[in-house]
Regions:
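Conserved GNAT acetyl-CoA-binding A-motif
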Residues: 116, 123-135
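Conserved GNAT-fold acetyl-CoA-binding loop/helix
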Residues: 19, 26-46
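Conserved active-site alpha-helix within GNAT-family acetyltransferase domains
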Residues: 113, 125, 137-155
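Conserved acyl-donor/pantetheine-binding loop and adjacent beta-alpha core of acyl/acetyltransferases
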Residues: 71-101, 107
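A short beta-loop-alpha structural element at the N-terminal edge
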Residues: 6-20
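Conserved beta-strand-loop-alpha-helix junction that forms the acyl-donor binding cleft
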Residues: 107, 133-143, 161
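Conserved catalytic-core motifs of GNAT/GCN5-like acyltransferases
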Residues: 74, 134-135, 147-166
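Conserved acetyl-CoA-binding loop-helix of GNAT-fold acetyltransferases
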Residues: 102, 108-121, 144, 148
Length: 173
């Protein structure tokens, strides 16, 4: 996938395309035996809320097709106030990426990394240098990508539902 990539704020007209990407990610996780995103999450309502709050972003191919999605949150994450086993690198303000997903046809082509870099740049524009993210313990593809790109394992956090997640962090340079 060598096309140029435009990353822009998601709009309500993107919801159908975003949900198609979400469904393809749910299927991929299911095929890997990972129970992440298997209970109707993220729902259309969650994506609408991201868009309404101004935190949803889409990656678009040259032809305008939406091929990736993420929520870039600069206001913290309630689940990150308690971390088990280890600790966050800093107690500074931080950016969190949620709901990172890429269309199955173009997976493993660097789109997720471009979305992550966009989140870093967005954070830096707001004076934030700490980047945090979490994923399901069984999501080894995501965990490898994070580790490959400088993220360190910081411990375990628990979502509002009580589900555990592996937490990662990195200082944005």
């Amino acid at each position: 996938f060598t096309q140029k990539m435009l990353i822009r704020q998601a709009e309500h007209r993107d919801i159908e395309a975003i949900m198609s990407i979400v469904r393809s990610a749910q299927l991929a996780l299911s095929e890997l035996g990972i129970d992440q995103w298997q209970n109707g999450y993220p729902s259309t309502e969650v994506i609408k809320q991201d868009i309404d709050c101004g935190v949803g972003y889409v990656a678009c191919a040259n032809d305008g097709k939406v091929v990736g999605y993420e929520a870039v949150v600069l206001t913290g994450e309630e689940a990150y106030t308690q971390i088990e086993d280890e600790k966050w690198h800093t107690s500074n303000n931080y950016v969190v990426v949620h709901r990172l997903c890429v269309l199955s046809d173009v997976r493993r082509s660097g789109i997720a990394i471009k979305l992550m870099r966009f989140a870093e740049e967005h954070a830096l524009k707001h004076g934030i240098r700490d980047f945090r993210i979490d994923t399901h313990e069984g999501n080894v593809v995501m965990r490898r990508m994070l580790e490959k790109h400088g993220f360190s394992h910081c411990g375990m956090i628990y979502l509002e539902s009580g589900d555990p997640r592996v937490a990662y962090g990195v200082e944005i340079l």
